[in-house]
């Protein structure tokens, strides 16, 4: 192998996980990797020839996408999950396990076909068992070259025209889900309604037996070089929460009551307008000898149409995510989805971890999630309230008033006032003093009840009350609807959502006590959760188990290499 080819191979093996793009249905596959003729058939200046010879070393590449135990059953008993094993005898011959598909004399692939594995505990959701060369194949891949160089890869990979691609999906914000683990099926008392979505995961292990000697020449290395990498695209914890269901159901009931509360408020609104009309008449009575507000009677009717609350009701089945993307709440299904990858510190925070790193829901993360949930619930409640306010503002309002003026107890005239229909929002904005709000027109009529009425004074009173009526009506609507109906609704929604936070905190506490998640699992390195093993040299992208029981112990995307001189 040439120096250039060897460097290309190592660089792409280690960088392919981060750079190669492979996605599920609806996206485009990009094979950014190396090709067979580049790492098998290169003959350039810079090699002493020994890298083109049989190594005399037996090497094995093994790749397995799923292994472990489910419901106390070892997955070794499932033939479709046996993975791939390729061995080179060091004398020029590579052989592979029975399920392997040969790509070239030294390279094999075994697409995963686990359709029969779906259980109450584990549901696989990626397209599996597709032909070699198809996009989106979850597969196992191995290569053992005659010179001893060996590679194993497991994950969302494909081989098309000899080009291998594996690793991160094209849309890291919404990666594909490989499998869903129903944790509640194992421990229903503690983890009811809890599921774990595992995103596309890949791993790669490489043995460089023959490579750069450091002097510009390629040859057998004094000590074989082992490199291991992994990629995990997503890890989402889903909590089906009765408190969320109850909050959405309670909000629905509250919204159904809004129109009835609106109708019930109308007599009070009319009374408020009447009271303020009498108060507004005080400075206008100067032309009517010895009259006081007690001599002015009003009869007011304020009519509001039924509210269209469609926009508010849509929010009851909406999905919302906090600003950091830590938690997504589906109010329609009552499920809170926690992005454990981002909770660990960023979009790729499951990756680049030291060997045998545990992913834990510690107190800091729990506090982050609590803050994120509060943000989502507050945003949702604010959106519901805003939608109700907008519905109120859009509804038409009409006001009719009759003002009877008496002198010495004798009615001398009746002033009729008519406003609308105009939108409630226009009247509210007049009350709020919003610049540019057009004044709603008011019609007036005057009925004289005596032979010599004070016409000029009555006209002045009518004009003054007509000018004041839109502002008086806006004030009544604000006090009765915004401060009354809407604020009461807001308080009730707060009461509906208040149990959600403590319920999630309790669920996370249970999960943290029982669920163990480890990334970049390497049995020969410190911190390995099992018995330390020095051979084979392997890497597993994700290991998931439930402690202290053994009903679930799942390893995802394992690649390993072994060699004997």
Please state what every model-predicted region is:
Residues 51-565:
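Extended, solvent-exposed, non-transmembrane regions
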Residues 6-59:
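Short, polar/proline-rich extracytoplasmic segments that appear immediately after membrane translocation
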Residues 1-5:
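N-terminal secretory signal peptides that target proteins for export/translocation
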């Amino acid at each position: 192998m040439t120096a250039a080819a060897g460097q290309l191979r190592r660089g792409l093996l280690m960088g392919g996980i981060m750079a190669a793009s492979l996605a599920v249905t609806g996206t485009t596959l990009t094979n950014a990797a190396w090709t067979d003729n580049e790492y098998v058939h290169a003959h350039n200046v810079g090699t002493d020839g020994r890298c083109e010879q049989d190594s005399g070393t037996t090497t094995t590449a093994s790749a397995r996408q799923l292994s472990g135990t489910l419901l106390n059953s070892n997955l070794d008993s499932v033939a479709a999950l046996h993975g791939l094993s390729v061995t080179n005898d060091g004398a020029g011959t590579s052989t592979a396990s029975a399920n392997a598909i040969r790509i070239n004399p030294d390279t094999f692939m075994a697409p995963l076909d686990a359709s029969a594995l779906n259980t109450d505990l584990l549901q696989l959701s990626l397209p599996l068992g597709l032909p070699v060369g198809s996009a989106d194949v979850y597969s196992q891949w191995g290569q053992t070259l005659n010179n001893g160089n060996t590679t194993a890869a497991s994950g969302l990979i494909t081989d098309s025209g000899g080009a291998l691609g594996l690793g991160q999906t094209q849309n890291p914000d919404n990666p594909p889900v490989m499998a869903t683990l129903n944790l509640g099926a194992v421990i229903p008392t503690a983890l009811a309604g809890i599921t774990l979505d595992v995103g596309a995961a890949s791993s790669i292990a490489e043995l460089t037996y023959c490579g750069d000697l450091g002097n510009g020449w390629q040859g057998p290395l004094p000590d074989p070089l082992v490199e291991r990498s992994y990629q995990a695209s997503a890890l989402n914890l889903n909590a089906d929460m009765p408190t969320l269901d109850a909050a959405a159901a309670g909000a629905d009931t509250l919204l159904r009551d809004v129109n009835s509360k609106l109708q019930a408020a109308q007599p009070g609104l009319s009374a408020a307008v009447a009271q303020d009309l009498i108060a507004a008449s005080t400075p206008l009575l100067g032309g009517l000898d010895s009259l006081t507000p007690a001599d002015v009677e009003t009869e007011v009717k304020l009519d509001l149409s039924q509210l269209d609350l469609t926009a508010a009701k849509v929010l009851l089945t909406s999905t919302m995510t906090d600003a950091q993307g830590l938690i997504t709440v589906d109010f329609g299904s009552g499920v809170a989805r926690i992005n454990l990858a981002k909770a660990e510190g960023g979009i790729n925070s499951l990756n680049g971890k030291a060997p045998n790193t545990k992913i834990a829901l510690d107190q800091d993360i729990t506090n982050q999630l609590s803050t994120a949930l509060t943000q989502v619930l507050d945003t949702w409640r604010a959106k519901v309230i805003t939608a109700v306010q907008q519905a109120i503002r859009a509804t038409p309002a009409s006001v009719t008033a009759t003002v009877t003026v008496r002198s010495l107890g004798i009615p001398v005239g009746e002033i009729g006032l008519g406003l609308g229909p105009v939108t409630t929002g226009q009247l509210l904005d007049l009350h709020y003093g919003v610049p540019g709000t057009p004044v709603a027109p008011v019609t007036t009529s005057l009925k004289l009840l005596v032979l010599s009425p004070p016409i000029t004074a009555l006209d002045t009173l009518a004009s003054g009350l007509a000018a004041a009526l839109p502002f008086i009506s806006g004030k009544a609507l604000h006090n009765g609807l915004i401060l009354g109906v809407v604020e009461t609704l807001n308080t009730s929604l707060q009461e509906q959502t208040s149990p959600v936070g403590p319920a999630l905190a309790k669920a996370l506490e249970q999960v943290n006590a029982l669920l163990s998640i480890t990334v970049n699992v390497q049995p020969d390195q410190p911190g390995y959760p099992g018995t330390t093993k020095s051979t084979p040299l392997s890497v597993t992208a994700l290991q998931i188990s439930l402690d202290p029981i053994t009903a679930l112990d799942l390893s995802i995307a394992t690649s390993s290499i072994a060699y004997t001189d």
